[in-house]
């Protein structure tokens, strides 16, 4: 046995062990110190003196207030520009056409996000040490009134975006895709945004059930000059839930669609290259709209329109990695998480993974933390970026 070649872990694991040594512990120590100050020192019988009497901070994972990853709750949203990333919930499911429950998506995602630490092993990223993150709570949506809710959503997202904080939206059904992009476009001036849309459904109908529902966001978003249809990339489309009315719009507007078969046959890297090239052609930034049902239904049962045959989690996460690291990302939303239909929080956990990976890739690619507002953010709001809706 002494002559045997010593075991060496694969290169990624070996690199991960080294990366961890380069990370500071400043944020962790600040959290401990604050916890002991605000939460009182522990009882005398507790040997680990970093533990307070009242839970403050990451540990224990089953306790505490459910903000996203236990990030600070920002009561005064006027101060959001002081943070690198702002998490905002949009508890709206009045746009659903089948199974409701996505109004509870933000709660479900926040609750299971407590399971995560801020550190990712493979990437060697510690979000607590490398960015400032806050949770601004939820936008006040209006039940049973999509248009009033859309107005609220656009105003809220425009506020966060214009502040310079990176907005991450917890949906909510996919009808919110239109007002979130509208909020972004209000502060783009003459700049343009490409949209990369992960989904099993095209979501390009003009109306559904006589309203702008979760099947309709991209028809209306791509009506705006700041969000051209030629820069809309749709990844994972397919199956038995793609209305022909929406297909007609995709054909007429020449959106860029890849099915799951396209992606697997051309390779993940080729699919990522395609998405990046089309979304960035003549645009200044990229918006990512991640519908959780793009993942195969066996992995994400807690959604409004589950469809078998979707992407595997590792496939979607790899595409996300390539796209975020190689484009100028201005924000993202994760939609269609419906906790009432979930099993063991697995859908909410998948959404959490998408969000945490996104933040880590932004750090690795140098997009976060920000030292100044991106040049594509225009200070003055253009409230007329979209056509009036009657």
Swiss-Prot record:
GO terms for biological process: putrescine biosynthetic process from arginine, via agmatine. Keywords: Cytoplasm, Hydrolase, Metal-binding, Nickel. Gene3D superfamilies: Ureohydrolase domain. It holds the Pfam family Arginase. Its cofactor is Ni(2+). It comes from the Bacteria. GO terms for molecular function: agmatinase activity; metal ion binding. One of its GO terms (cellular component) is cytoplasm. It is found in: Cytoplasm. Its EC number is 3.5.3.-. Catalyzes the hydrolysis of guanidine into urea and ammonium. Is highly specific for free guanidine. At pH 8, also catalyzes the release of urea from methylguanidine but with significantly reduced specific activity compared with that for guanidine. Cannot hydrolyze guanidinoacetate, guanidinopropionate, guanidinobutyrate, agmatine, arginine or creatine. Required to use guanidine as the sole nitrogen source for growth. Overexpression of the gene accelerates guanidine degradation and promotes biomass growth. Belongs to the arginase family. This is Guanidine hydrolase. The gene is gdmH.
